[in-house]
Amino acid sequence: MVDLVMRQTGGLAGRRLNDSGRSILMSLALSQVKEELVLYQKQSGSRELVELMLSALKEFKMCGIRPEDLKAAADRLEEGNLRKKIRETGLVMAAYEALVSQSYIDPLDDLTRLKNVLEATPFFKGYTVMVDAFAGFTAQELEVLSLVLRQAKETVISVCVDQDPAKDNGMGLFS
């Protein structure tokens, strides 16, 4: 869906990052903010911290958490290691995002970019949209799905039920 919308609205141009590119940019981001780090300063050049930050980055993006959200969360906490970790993670993520925005498109941002396009363009107006083959939705996916539901003329969602009707004596929701 991302590819289709972006092809028709012009959002595919740019160099797409892969895992190697992400690692390089995360290393650069850690170098840029090294002097501002307390808890992570000693490990800022380590491969392990790069991998840890990339793993956190992927989780945050799927959950729709931005660097400024981390800063706001840290500001609400009392002084301590948790506050420092969240604050420092937000600093690293902000530096990483700034590096990416200079020249690259991160596929991890595809759904966020799609959401932004759908907020500005009624792409699905007049269409019937079918939603199938899912086990659940991430925060990014829910934001996009919400916009699709508002725009589409009709939306059909298949519900997967791996349930034995005999277990509920034929009285279940999908019996």
What are these regions (language model features)?
Residues 1-72, 76, 80:
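Conserved P-loop NTPase-based nucleic-acid remodeling module centered on helicase motor cores
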Residues 18-19, 69-175:
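Conserved helicase NTPase motor core
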